[in-house]
């Protein structure tokens, strides 16, 4: 039976008594009406015990903080990115060192992007249910079925950790995992908004450079507003409205309001702020990369790079897309230098194969 922890001192006492070398971690949170996730439950495995920790209790997150940052305790988590953001918001810290079982499974050749249930079945043979996936985790008390579902989310992490550690050790890939886990942590730790968000929108490639800069202004403003007001980005300004305003900039505020009339979700109450954002140049916008459709030549180079990466992945027993995504390769073509996002171990296993192809395309 899992232990329901409602006093910070109880959490501290249990962890001090156990002094574990590893803890299994998961969270339940809600993010339907906010920009930032709201922590609703923390599940923690310690040895044979499972603690279900109520973060709504005053002082609980402060008690958690000490153990999340203990460098002598490995934090075993599955697909941790959203949980990391949640811990950062609630506790102000990130759990380190991190062993992400989803990343580890991919690096070990077990499978790419594996869900927790599938990985549990693969390693332990246990079939988990999905009964409480859409549950209300903020309500109290939690139901017995919620408690059992939550406990299952960490119950099998150590068995998976042991098996994947064994495989990665045999394959000499534990260093790969450490690098990827630290990159994930750094991404969350230093997230202050995407610098060039317009490049990620498919519609941007059809806009003229001046329109792309206007789109960049709107998206940067939207992200700042979403963070400050703790509301989803789409509630501030959705992509369709932003793209239309960038493509067809209104001549004045009245014209802006007329354009808003065409879109039910347009933020009429924020019209003045939208107008200012649209018409206020950013200090760095002249340096912004432009989204553009690939040329025939670049398409051919991209195809050769993708084929080479796929072959290398097959040789290493890695799932497709793990070594380098399409976007990584597009960045490589644009920059003509190794993308920082691909890191060191990928460079070691890929650079000798892909860089000659890139150099040949320039000849």
UniProtKB/Swiss-Prot annotation:
Subcellular location per the Swiss-Prot or TrEMBL entry: Cytoplasm
EC numbers for this chain: 3.1.13.5
Annotated keywords: Cytoplasm, Exonuclease, Hydrolase, Nuclease, tRNA processing
Record-linked SUPFAM superfamilies: HRDC-like (SSF47819), Ribonuclease H-like (SSF53098)
Reaction(s) this enzyme catalyzes, per UniProt: Exonucleolytic cleavage that removes extra residues from the 3'-terminus of tRNA to produce 5'-mononucleotides
Keyword Hydrolase: yes
Chief location bin: cytoplasm
Enzyme superclass (EC): hydrolase
GO cellular component, one term: cytoplasm
tRNA processing among keywords: yes
Signal sequence range: none
Entries under PROSITE patterns matching the protein: HRDC
Residue ranges annotated for the HRDC domain, each copy included: 208-288
Residues annotated as domain 3'-5' exonuclease: 5-168
CC cofactor: a divalent metal cation
GO MF, one annotated term: nucleotide binding
Biological process (GO), any one: tRNA 3'-end processing
Domain of life: Bacteria
Similarity section: Belongs to the RNase D family.
Described purpose of this protein according to its UniProt entry: Exonuclease involved in the 3' processing of various precursor tRNAs. Initiates hydrolysis at the 3'-terminus of an RNA molecule and releases 5'-mononucleotides.
HAMAP family assigned to the protein according to its UniProt record, in alphabetical order: RNase_D (MF_01899)
Protein name per the record: Ribonuclease D
Organism (species): Xanthomonas oryzae pv. oryzae (strain KACC10331 / KXO85)
Organism ancestry: Bacteria, Pseudomonadati, Pseudomonadota, Gammaproteobacteria, Lysobacterales
């Amino acid at each position: 039976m899992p232990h329901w922890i409602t006093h910070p001192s109880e959490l501290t006492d249990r962890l001090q008594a156990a002094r574990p070398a590893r803890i299994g971690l998961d969270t339940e949170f809600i993010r339907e009406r906010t920009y930032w996730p709201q922590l609703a439950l923390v599940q923690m495995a310690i040895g044979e015990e499972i603690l279900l920790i109520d973060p709504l209790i005053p002082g609980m997150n402060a008690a958690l903080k000490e153990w999340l940052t203990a460098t002598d305790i490995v934090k075993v988590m599955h697909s941790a990115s959203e949980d990391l953001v949640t811990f950062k918001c609630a506790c102000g810290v990130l759990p380190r060192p991190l062993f992400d079982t989803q990343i580890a499974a991919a690096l070990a050749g077990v499978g790419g992007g594996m869900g927790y249930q599938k990985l549990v079945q693969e390693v332990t043979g246990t079939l988990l249910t999905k009964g409480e996936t859409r549950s209300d985790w903020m309500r109290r008390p939690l139901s017995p079925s919620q408690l059992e579902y939550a406990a299952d989310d960490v119950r099998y992490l150590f068995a998976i950790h042991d098996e994947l550690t064994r495989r990665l050790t045999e394959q000499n890939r534990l260093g790969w995992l450490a690098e990827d886990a630290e990159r994930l942590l750094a991404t969350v730790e230093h997230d202050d908004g995407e610098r060039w968000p317009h490049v990620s929108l498919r519609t941007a490639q059809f806009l003229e450079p001046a329109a792309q800069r206007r789109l960049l202004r709107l998206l940067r403003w939207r992200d700042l507003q979403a963070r400050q007001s703790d509301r989803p980005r789409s509630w501030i300004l959705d992509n369709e409205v932003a793209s239309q305003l960038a493509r067809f900039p209104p001549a004045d505020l009245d014209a802006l309001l007329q354009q808003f009339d065409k879109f039910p979700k347009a933020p009429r109450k924020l019209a003045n702020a939208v107008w200012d954002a649209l018409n206020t140049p950013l200090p760095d916008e002249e340096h912004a990369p432009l989204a553009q459709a690939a040329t025939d030549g670049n398409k051919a180079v991209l195809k050769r790079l993708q084929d080479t990466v796929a072959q290398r992945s097959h040789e290493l027993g890695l799932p497709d897309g793990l070594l380098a995504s399409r976007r990584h390769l597009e960045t490589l073509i644009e920059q003509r230098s190794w993308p920082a996002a691909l890191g060191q171990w990928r460079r070691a296993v890929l650079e000798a194969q892909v860089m000659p192809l890139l150099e040949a395309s320039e000849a």
